[in-house]
Amino acid sequence: MKLTSLVRKLADRVTRRFGYRLVPQSLLDLYQIESEISLETKRLEMGSIAGAAVYLRRDNPRLLELRTLYAGLDPALKTPLLWTEEFVSRTDILNFRGHNGWVWQWRNPGLDELAYHLAAYYVLARDQLGLMEKLSEDGTFGALAYDIAGHWVSRDLLDSILEIGFLDRHLNIATCPPLSVLDIGAGYGRLAHRMLTAIPSLGNYLCADAIPESSFVCEYYLRFRGLEGRFTVVPATEIDWALNLTRADLAMNIHSFSECSLSAVEWWLDRLAAHGVKHFMIVPNACGHDGELLRNIDGEDMQPLIERSGYRLVVKEPKYSDPGVQKFALNPTWFWLFERSGGA
């Protein structure tokens, strides 16, 4: 017992230097000690998706083709802060909707089960478009889902409903003439899937990325969801060509610029300015400031670059309008909407 006590004291002394304390497990709430195994059981029971394991392979010719294409990227895009070759090589492309760099779903602060419950009830109370009834979660490809108030919910679903609601409040996207959308850093196609499903009248949806694996799974996933013909996967090497063909009314960057170097951010902003994209929505990572600042994970400020590109801030609001919910609910951040000065 004395040896155990000594070890605990020594360990506590070490962890204190890094801002942590050792406490007895008996003092923790259940959600704080929930194990990886118990979280895994909360995933929806799904059979294997026919053909997924055969197609979603790193030696797939389509992925190899995209890698060759992306090798010609502008050098400004080749200094990622997070999505390095090593990081990408460790990402599970079969379970691309699981807990990974595309959508963090647990372990991190603000991603415990209570945060999911609080976010779900908040969405149910403020869902002006009725998207909790129009959209659903089936747990495919590894998505972590909880059964809350009669709905299977995931971070994919809840974040998407809140983002679509924000855009509708300020740009009336559900009722305005069909928009053409550019999704920068579209990942596996999370928001593309949700927006195209929620708003059938939505015009062409461009999914752009600088990571070949993202474009690969995005293309597969949106086809899997039956959205063929309503989206275009655009490699960063072809973005100017795509925007010359289809002018984008709205550009979005959701949790992507936060993981980019300033040179990469500036490269994308130059594209938006050159092609006259009128509105630009950005959602930053929390990065220690809960998304109230537009900084990347290195702490560099992106807002001056955005403003120098001719965009002015028109709306900035918390993801959850209630301060208590914003503090404790799922992955709190802020939503920013910019408009191109003098743009039409």
Regions found by a protein language model. Give the residues of each.
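A short, conserved alpha-helix within the catalytic core of class I
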Residues: 260-272
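S-adenosyl-L-methionine
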Residues: 219-245
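Conserved SAM-binding loop of SAM-dependent methyltransferases across substrates and taxa
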Residues: 189-200
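Conserved class I S-adenosyl-L-methionine
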Residues: 176-187
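Conserved SAM-binding motif I beta-strand of class I
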Residues: 204-209
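Conserved beta-strand signature within the Rossmann-like core of class I S-adenosyl-L-methionine
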Residues: 276-288
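Conserved Class I S-adenosyl-L-methionine-dependent methyltransferase catalytic core
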Residues: 68-174
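Membrane-proximal basic amphipathic "stem/tether" segments
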Residues: 1-70
